[in-house]
Design a protein with these regions (language model features):
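Conserved RNase H-like, two-metal-ion catalytic cores of nucleic-acid enzymes
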Residues: 1-108
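Catalytic-loop motifs flanking and including active-site residues across diverse enzymes
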Residues: 73, 110, 153-156
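Surface-exposed charge patches
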Residues: 75, 112, 180
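Short alpha-helix plus adjacent loop in nuclease-associated cores
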Residues: 92-120, 126-136, 146
Length: 220
């Protein structure tokens, strides 16, 4: 029987280096970006929290991987492979528990989903306080707080999966996978043709402006 692992990355962010403003690939490729922690919790009792370079990625091979918002964590993993940040492995599946709980009628966020499912309040103040802080500049107390926060997120991700996975239809799973794959692949664009047509459009716009009889005159 294959093992299921919940996985969660913790990354540097600030007002400029932010996925909210840059999108996934813009964020991951930002010069200030740093994926300094990964937490992994398995349904076999396995736990890891630390730098991604210290994690044994091979244990994910032929296993199911879960992330709460896999469009972030899986996409970061795939991007990191292209940058040689960590090893390439082949999980059996990578499921998004955020998509799962939404399909099951729960709020999408981990905080609100666990509040409704388990009447459990979890604080996101640690994540808020991580803004603008690099791992190497955090004091030891805050480092431990971040580690505990990361592990808790993975534990709750796994718990939601164990309780709601049977209620998640195959149809909704397929939609989740296809949407995420489409985002990761992006849109195919012929950039040379785009630039050529943009220049042609600018030239045509200039010609049209020159044909306006009162063009270039000051308004009365």
């Amino acid at each position: 029987m294959e093992t299921t692992y919940a996985l969660d990355f913790e990354t540097y962010y600030d007002k400029d280096c932010s996925i909210r403003h840059l999108g996934p690939l813009g964020y991951f490729s930002h010069p200030d970006f740093d994926a300094y922690m990964v937490s992994v919790v398995g349904d076999n009792g396995y736990q890891f929290v630390g730098h991604p370079k210290d994690f044994d990625w091979s244990i994910l091979t032929d296993s199911d991987v879960l992330s709460h918002n896999a469009s972030f964590d899986e996409t970061l993993y795939l991007y990191g492979v292209t940058q040689n940040w960590w090893a390439e492995v082949k999980p059996l599946n990578w499921f998004c528990t955020a998509d799962m709980v939404a399909a099951c009628g729960l709020p999408r966020s981990l905080k609100n989903a666990t509040a409704q499912a388990y009447n459990m309040e979890i604080s996101k103040s640690t994540r808020d306080n991580m803004s603008g802080k690099r791992w190497e500049t955090m004091d030891e107390d805050f480092k431990r707080e971040v580690e505990e926060y990361a592990l808790k997120d993975s534990e709750l991700c796994l718990k939601l999966w164990q309780d709601y996975n049977p209620k998640w239809s195959q149809f909704e799973r397929d939609i989740s996978r296809m949407n995420r794959t489409a985002v990761q692949r992006g849109l195919p664009i012929n950039t040379d043709l785009l630039a050529k047509n943009l220049n042609a459009l600018k030239e045509k716009l200039f010609e049209c402006e020159q044909n306006i009889p009162w063009g270039g005159e000051k308004p009365l």
